[in-house]
């Protein structure tokens, strides 16, 4: 019975991963309605989630997991989240309402284009667009409305919703003449609350898990602590990316105004911009980091297999180069921040340069104690600067889109990119694990990967679900199966398999484990780059 439940749970999860991958491709080729009909809203998709949940709970109980409070809490939190999603699917409604200034109506349209009626009236008093000073770049969209017959007046804007009698209203779009507004309407009195309760339980359990005794994480950590390899990987932590869907027109102008990239309002900013434009492309820097990273990587693999340490002159010389790279990155990021007035949280160029900044900083802080951080850190810095160098020759510095002006942006983005960076370290560690001939070295590197994977998966989970909260606050849907969020979920599930070596025997084999972590990183690449470049969705602005 226990074995049957185990295979049902993990088997259903594997099929769900395959279905979600296929769904994002079908959506690109055939459109969103077809993807929802064939996959996301299909009976098979729902049944598979139910099978994975029920079989998983039975297996956990039979395995004795309830005795481990926080481990059980992680899984119960996921069950609560899925329960909330089911309630939303069965009983929640959403749609849109079109208003013209001075018009009163109770009629709106559901997402499936079915007419519906509100139990009250709503009137648009005025609609306006605020712009960044000196530009035609939208800063915010505002709808002043009144709920009738009581006459409650409210203002709806980006990240500022209206709630009335169990309904929530969000700024979604507007008419070309500026005299009309389109509001998203959501009515889900139970599903959101249940889902949020699951998010909270999951967060508390993820924190508590690191203090729980005799978990696979604690055992791997103890083994890693006894060797001179890279416990340092655990400490590496960078920043930005995103994972929630945005309705069309929400916070993104349909036509960009033909304006200067940014209005530089002082002589100091003009001079800073000239310096920034002269040094912003890190071509020499990425080539140096990649070359040094590859050399140190090969040297590290040889030394680990022979149980020897890095020569001191190699470590200190590499640290000097890391310091120069860090100073360069600090200057570029600082100039960009000063000129734009916006932190480096949005855009591929910002993301890649900030990842490189954290990578070089980690080398400086940790290389004396954990030498393996040098090859992995240089490789990450090199690859991320390579990607940054392939962005536009003159990276535009633009104000944030209205929907991105949220305090949740930096937290969401930082947690997602921290997880992606840690997954990158695990992938490089996996390559080294396959390269070294010693079985003992392979096992040790597997332990290093496990120590990194737990916080990486938890950060990805936290960032994804925080993005869901942000989406619900901003446009009324905490999960809309946008390709970006779907691939974030796929990545989460793919990496979750690596944390279940106790139940899945292949993951106890170091060669299989290292090979799997390399394959799994492809999911990260698809999530961040593939969705933007190939699959589309509303995250391509990132």
What kind of feature is each model-predicted range?
Residues 1-542:
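Solvent-exposed, non-transmembrane regions of integral membrane proteins
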């Amino acid at each position: 019975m226990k074995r049957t439940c185990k295979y049902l749970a993990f088997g259903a999860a594997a099929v769900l991963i395959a279905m979600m991958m296929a769904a994002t491709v079908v959506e690109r080729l055939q459109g969103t309605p077809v993807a929802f009909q064939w996959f996301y809203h299909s009976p098979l998709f729902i049944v598979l989630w139910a099978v994975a949940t029920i079989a998983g709970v039975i297996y956990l109980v039979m395995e004795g997991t309830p005795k481990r409070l926080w481990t059980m809490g992680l899984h119960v939190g996921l069950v609560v989240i899925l329960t909330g999603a089911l309630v939303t699917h069965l009983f929640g409604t959403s749609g849109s309402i079109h208003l013209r200034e001075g018009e009163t109506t109770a009629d709106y349209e559901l997402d499936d284009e079915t007419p519906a009626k509100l139990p009250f009236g709503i009137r648009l008093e005025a609609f306006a667009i605020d712009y960044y000073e000196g530009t035609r770049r939208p800063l915010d969209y505002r709808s002043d409305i009144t709920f009738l017959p009581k006459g409650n007046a409210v203002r709806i804007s980006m990240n500022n919703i209206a709630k009335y009698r169990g309904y929530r209203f969000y700024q979604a779009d507007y008419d070309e003449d500026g005299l009309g507004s389109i509001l998203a309407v959501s009515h889900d009195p139970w599903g959101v609350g249940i889902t949020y309760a699951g998010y909270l339980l999951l967060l508390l359990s993820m924190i508590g898990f690191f203090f729980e005794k005799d978990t696979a994480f604690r055992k791997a950590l103890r083994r890693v602590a006894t060797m001179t390899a890279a416990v340092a990987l655990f400490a590496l932590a960078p920043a930005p990316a995103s994972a929630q869907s945005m309705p069309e027109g929400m916070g993104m102008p349909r036509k960009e105004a033909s304006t200067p990239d940014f209005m530089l309002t002082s002589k100091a900013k003009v001079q800073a911009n000239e310096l920034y434009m002269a040094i912003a492309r890190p071509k020499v820097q990425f080539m140096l980091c990649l070359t040094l990273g590859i050399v140190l990587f090969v040297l590290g693999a040889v030394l680990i297999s022979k149980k020897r340490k890095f020569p001191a002159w190699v470590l200190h010389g590499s640290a000097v180069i890391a310091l120069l790279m860090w100073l360069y990155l600090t200057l570029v990021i600082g100039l960009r921040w000063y000129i734009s007035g916006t932190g480096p949280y949005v855009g591929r160029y910002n993301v890649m340069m900030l990842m490189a900044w954290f990578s070089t900083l980690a080398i400086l802080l940790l290389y004396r104690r954990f030498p393996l951080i040098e090859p992995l850190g240089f490789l990450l810095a090199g690859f991320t600067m390579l990607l940054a160098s392939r962005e536009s020759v003159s990276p535009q510095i633009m104000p944030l889109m209205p929907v991105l002006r949220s305090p949740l942006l930096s937290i969401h983005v930082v947690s997602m990119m921290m997880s992606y960076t840690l997954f990158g370290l695990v992938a490089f560690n996996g390559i080294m694990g396959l390269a070294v001939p010693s079985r003992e070295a392979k096992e040790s590197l597997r332990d290093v990967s496990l120590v990194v994977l737990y916080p990486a998966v938890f950060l990805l989970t936290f960032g994804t679900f925080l993005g869901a909260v942000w989406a619900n606050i901003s446009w009324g849907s905490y999960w809309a199966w946008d390709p970006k969020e779907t691939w974030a979920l796929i990545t989460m599930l793919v990496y979750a398999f690596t944390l279940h070596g106790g139940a899945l025997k292949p993951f106890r084999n170091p060669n299989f484990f290292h090979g799997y972590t390399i394959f799994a990183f492809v999911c990260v690449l698809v999530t961040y780059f593939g969705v933007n470049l190939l699959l589309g969705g509303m995250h391509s602005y990132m």
